[in-house]
Amino acid sequence: MGENADGDQVMENLLQLRCHFTWKLLFENNDIPDLEVRISEQVQFLDIKNPLGMHNLLAYVRHLKGQQDEALQSLKEAEALIQSEQLSKRSLATWGNCAWLHYHRGSLAEAQIYLDKVEKVCKEFSSPFRYRLECAEMDCEEGWALLKCGGGNYKQAMACFAKALKVEPENPEYNTGYAVVAYRQDLDDNFISLEPLRKAVRLNPEDPYLKVLLALKLQDLGEHVEAEAHIEEALSSTSCQSYVIRYAAKYFRRKHRVDKALHLLNRALQASPSSGYLHYQKGLCYKQQISQLRTSRNRQPRRQDNVQELAQQAIHEFQETLKLRPTFEMAYVCMAEVQAEIHQYEEAERNFQKALNNKTLVAHIEQDIHLRYGRFLQFHKQSEDKAITLYLKGLKVEEKSFAWRKLLTALEKVAERRVCQNVHLVESTSLLGLVYKLKGQEKNALFYYEKALRLTGEMNPAF
């Protein structure tokens, strides 16, 4: 009975800690192997002044995999960093994780030792909590952990870095974290990451990763000269590794220098053969080459053979991506679009449906999948009714993203064409009413709704 009571007390204390076991890190179980690879790469390649957090996250992921000995080893590496760098506040997450891990291993005495270490630091900094310290350093640690665990965590990660920056506005690491997570969320045309990236580069002038992200954002804005300068600086850096090269490859692919992008990706894959993201980027390169062939004026007889060959290469790369990251929904979508290009319609439809079946889709991704699946149905399967259904489902996801606006445009175009061609006239006119309502143009919306009602009356006098 006493042992259970001790266990209950230890658990009560553990729940007060700020560490990876208590932060609500959202990711799918299927993502854990790829997450482990990405964390290992970040520890190895990404020039972070303090890799302590990545060792801690690696330990947590290994714990989730049931690899308790390996998890303990990662925490020992983190503890070694604490001792060598004389860290105090930032040691709290490590010691908290150690306490949790020993608890799960059944070592209550060991767990209590680490709880005592946390308590000592909390007392040192006059925390009102016995096992918890509110400080910028811990906000930063939590922010990095959330950032690394994927899109479902980005808003919370941004809040953590913003909170830390209120305390130290010029801190280089806090600005790095804030800029990176802003970039990851900057998927619309409001460019929320541009100034944070500029500031982070100013505070971290030797960081090639930040430079390549800034280059990509400048490319979005059409600032090509400045973007190219940052890319050249990033690639010439002595610390430039595969984590930087993959983003540089994205820059060159978007610049239509696909051969250069493929060269960089192959170079990065030699260092990181288990990176799902690198395979995905290669797939996008082959997909872009297919589009270039389709729009080329050069009508060579072998062009269709080239399309088939490129399609198979793209599909292979997306399949490799999904072996490593089984829940990466956009790999399914891009593979489906390539399959549609070579008339593999059944396979394409299955992959679109797999992408939509992911229950953890963030809003703008869900909207984008509905848009691209709808286009497939409209233009490849000639099924406008089903396409309209998908556009409407996407618009029900209410976040006003870039994808949401493209859905609205797609619905407007198909409705206008159907009205002109007198196809399902009442329904099509009503759809135009909905389009204008969603645009906020109430007067136009009312016009089309009333027109639809009049058409209904003409077609069905008994109504």
Swiss-Prot record:
SMART domains: TPR. TPR repeats lie at residues 52-85, 92-125, 138-171, 174-207, 209-241, 242-275, 294-328, 329-362, 367-401, 426-459. Coiled coil: none annotated. Pfam families: TPR_16, TPR_8. RNA binds at K250, Q281, R325. GO terms for molecular function: RNA binding; RNA sequestering activity. This is Antiviral innate immune response effector IFIT1. InterPro entries: TPR-like_helical_dom_sf, TPR_rpt. It is found in: Cytoplasm. Gene3D superfamilies: Tetratricopeptide repeat domain (1.25.40.10). Interacts with EIF3C. Interacts (via TPR repeats 4-7) with EEF1A1. Plays a key role in the innate immune response as part of an interferon-dependent multiprotein complex, recognizing and sequestering viral RNAs that lack host-specific 2'-O-methylation at their 5' cap. By distinguishing these RNAs from host mRNAs, inhibits their translation by competing with the translation initiation factor eIF4E. Induction: By type I interferons, dsRNAs and viruses. MRNA binds at W144. Its main location: cytoplasm. Keywords: Antiviral defense, Cytoplasm, Immunity, Innate immunity, Phosphoprotein, Repeat, RNA-binding, TPR repeat.
